[in-house]
Amino acid sequence: MMKMCRYALITALAIFLAGCAGLREQPAPVEEAKPQPQQPAQPQPTVPTVPAVPSVPAQPGPIEHQDQQSGQPAPRVRHYDWNGAVQPLVGQMLQASGVNAGSILLVDSVNNRTNGSLNAGEATTALRSALAGNGKFTLVSAQQLAVAKQQLGLSPQDSLGSRSKAMGIARNVGAQYVLYSNATGNVNAPELKMQLMLVQTGEIIWSGKGAVQQQ
């Protein structure tokens, strides 16, 4: 009786183990893969490229001028012996023939025709001083000449600049003669040229020239 029970127990255990082995050998269920719908790729928005800004070159600063007074020598001021130049020329003119004593003479300002700058006003002053008190001509006063120049739109210091203007003013002030003078040549050694003209005809009665020395 005991043997039968042992046999039955062994048989039952063998069946149980065989069942467990069968359960282990069964494959796991395979799930069918379902295709997923593909989403269309979203286009990436294009980002506009910003052009590179060119670099601005550094602007030069304001140009600073050096003080000309301290950095450069002052221009040379020339002084001339106008009295020494006009005295002999006036003496020659007063000895000229064909000049009626007591005639009215217009002395035009000396014109600067040199290649540089000079004070022609000093030459005019020296010329009028040399003629002052002569016994042959009566000079048109500086006031009369200034008024006549203003009528032409000129300042009293302006030279008439041409023989035709000098003759026109001489007629306006009632002068019979005009003394027309130029400083010419090199400004370092100018030459003074003078012409005495008859207003009525424009004839040159006398002419002369002389060197002007620097002082």
Swiss-Prot record:
It is a lipid-anchor. Residues 49-58 have a biased composition (Low complexity). PROSITE patterns: PROKAR_LIPOPROTEIN (PS51257). InterPro entries: LpoB. Keywords: Cell outer membrane, Cell shape, Lipoprotein, Membrane, Palmitate, Peptidoglycan synthesis, Signal. PANTHER family: PENICILLIN-BINDING PROTEIN ACTIVATOR LPOB. This is Penicillin-binding protein activator LpoB. It comes from Klebsiella pneumoniae subsp. pneumoniae (strain ATCC 700721 / MGH 78578). The gene is lpoB.
